Amino acid sequence: MALLTAETFRLQFNNKRRLRRPYYPRKALLCYQLTPQNGSTPTRGYFENKKKCHAEICFINEIKSMGLDETQCYQVTCYLTWSPCSSCAWELVDFIKAHDHLNLGIFASRLYYHWCKPQQKGLRLLCGSQVPVEVMGFPEFADCWENFVDHEKPLSFNPYKMLEELDKNSRAIKRRLERIKIPGVRAQGRYMDILCDAEV
């Protein structure tokens, strides 16, 4: 399995509200772990957005291509740098409805356009369709770091300090997500009534 470089993880899972110079693009990455209920070895991999295919759609296509045994249950855990956009939320819900032998859990480092109504609706749709969406905390960042990152090369930073900082930053994002899950709740001091049609 291909692994992320430590620097890619450090940059792309960075959940600070504002970036410092030099600026860099925050890409959409999805790391997944598929664990059979029978205790077999988990399958892992990752995807990033392509020009005409979001990482979530690449993930769905990959799982479909595996020809999984539908008489067996599987736990699927996904770690994303950005929460799914509204379009991908619908695709994920349809996918899980058609594959009820899969239990999917989504953990995101950051919330994608969280102030926009379509994205809020997408997150609520997922949570209401037995696809829990949560913000990554220390356990999820640590698990992602351990299982999806190449640790062979020397590091230019302290990984434990990085994980602690990610966990600290995630607390405000978790509160934001909890407000989104409840329609009509005030967010950032104002009603979340901004219309936004932006998509990547």
UniProtKB/Swiss-Prot annotation:
Changing P25A: Decreased DNA deaminase activity. Its main location: cytoplasm. Residues 4-126 form the CMP/dCMP-type deaminase domain. (Microbial infection) Following infection by some HIV-1 strains, such as isolate BRU/LAI, can be ubiquitinated by a cullin-5-RING E3 ubiquitin-protein ligase complex (ECS complex) hijacked by the HIV-1 Vif protein, leading to its degradation. Ubiquitination by the ECS complex is however less efficent compared to APOBEC3G or APOBEC3G. Its cofactor is Zn(2+). Zn(2+) binds at H54, C85, C88. Changing S129R: Resistance to ubiquitination and degradation by an ECS complex hijacked by HIV-1 Vif. Changing R110E: Decreased DNA deaminase activity. Its EC number is 3.5.4.38. Keywords: Antiviral defense, Coiled coil, Cytoplasm, Hydrolase, Immunity, Innate immunity, Metal-binding, Nucleus, Ubl conjugation, Zinc. It is an enzyme of class 3 (hydrolase). It is found in: Cytoplasm; Nucleus; Cytoplasm, P-body. Changing L125R: Resistance to ubiquitination and degradation by an ECS complex hijacked by HIV-1 Vif. Changing Y113A: Decreased DNA deaminase activity. Residues 160-182 form a coiled coil. APOBEC3H activity is regulated by RNA. While RNA-binding inhibits the DNA deaminase activity, double-stranded RNA is required for HIV-1 restriction by promoting APOBEC3H homodimerization and packaging into retroviral nucleocapsids. (Microbial infection) Antiviral activity is inhibited to some extent by the HIV-1 virion infectivity factor (VIF), that prevents its incorporation into progeny virions by both inhibiting its translation and/or by inducing its ubiquitination and subsequent degradation by the 26S proteasome. Changing E56Q: Reduces the ability to inhibit the retrotransposition of LINE-1 elements. DNA deaminase (cytidine deaminase) which acts as an inhibitor of retrovirus replication and retrotransposon mobility via deaminase-dependent and -independent mechanisms. The A3H-var/haplotype 2 exhibits antiviral activity against vif-deficient HIV-1. After the penetration of retroviral nucleocapsids into target cells of infection and the initiation of reverse transcription, it can induce the conversion of cytosine to uracil in the minus-sense single-strand viral DNA, leading to G-to-A hypermutations in the subsequent plus-strand viral DNA. This is DNA dC->dU-editing enzyme APOBEC-3H. It comes from Homo sapiens. The gene is APOBEC3H.
